């Protein structure tokens, strides 16, 4: 079988293939010595993997470039460049035009497209980042999103070096965030943020007391409220009715 011969050739060249039966390597792919391929890995088309990288398990790379020592787990990537020492996955989707810098991270349940992510920058989890340029040393909090499409055209987001975004920040493109800036949790960034500024979307929190008892009477939530209130009264030495 052709694939078995291809795999054997790479094994003899110093590539570790843990499970040849579930691994596919196209004849057009290139692997350096000391690469490790874990079960369920597909290395397709013109993908090139540098020395010391670990790919898999359950990973498909199509026309990708992988730097030395990178680790890619349970990921689908097409036409992506992954820098030396970077980590990707699990459950990441790297679409065409993704460039991840050295030591960077694209984490769990992250989708990227047409984006440059600088050295050491991290998009750790639950994010969509498309049509964006991200500087070095950036950290995007959980759930950060670049809203790049306005139903007519795609727009770019530019994020400077060492920016830190709070969880669930939405960058509404086109928008620029200056170096060292920060965003609060849940911020919707519609305007450019100057370097070193803190961007907030703040509205006063409003608590509607008694809403659950009035609108969800008899539910487990309402019963839990009653128990909590009774326990609070008891702890304060008040007489509990009923």
Predicted regions and their residues:
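Extended, small-residue-rich solenoid/repeat segments and analogous flexible loops
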Residues: 1-76, 82-87
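Glycine-rich hexapeptide-repeat left-handed beta-helix
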Residues: 63-242
């Amino acid at each position: 079988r052709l694939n078995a011969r291809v795999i054997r050739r790479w094994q003899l060249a110093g590539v570790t293939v843990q499970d040849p039966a579930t691994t596919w390597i196209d004849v057009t792919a290139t692997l350096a010595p000391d690469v490790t391929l874990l079960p369920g890995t597909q290395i397709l088309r013109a993908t090139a993997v540098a020395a010391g990288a670990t790919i898999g398990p359950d990973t498909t790379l199509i026309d990708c470039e992988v730097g030395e020592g990178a680790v890619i787990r349970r990921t689908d990537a097409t036409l992506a460049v992954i820098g030396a020492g970077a980590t990707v996955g699990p459950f990441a989707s790297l679409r065409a035009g993704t460039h991840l810098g050295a030591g960077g991270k694209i984490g769990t349940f992250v989708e990227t497209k047409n984006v440059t992510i600088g050295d050491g920058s991290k998009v750790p989890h639950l994010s969509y980042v498309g049509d964006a340029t991200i500087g070095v040393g950036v950290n995007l909090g959980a759930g950060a999103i670049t809203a790049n499409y306005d139903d007519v055209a795609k727009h770019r987001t530019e994020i400077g070096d060492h920016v830190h975004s709070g969880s669930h920040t939405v960058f509404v493109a086109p928008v620029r965030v200056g170096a060292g800036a920060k965003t609060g949790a849940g911020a919707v960034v519609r305007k450019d943020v100057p370097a070193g500024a803190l961007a907030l979307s703040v509205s006063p929190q409003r608590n509607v007391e008694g809403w659950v008892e009035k609108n969800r009477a008899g539910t487990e939530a309402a019963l839990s409220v009653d128990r909590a209130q009774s326990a609070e009264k008891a702890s304060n030495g008040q007489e509990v009715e009923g």
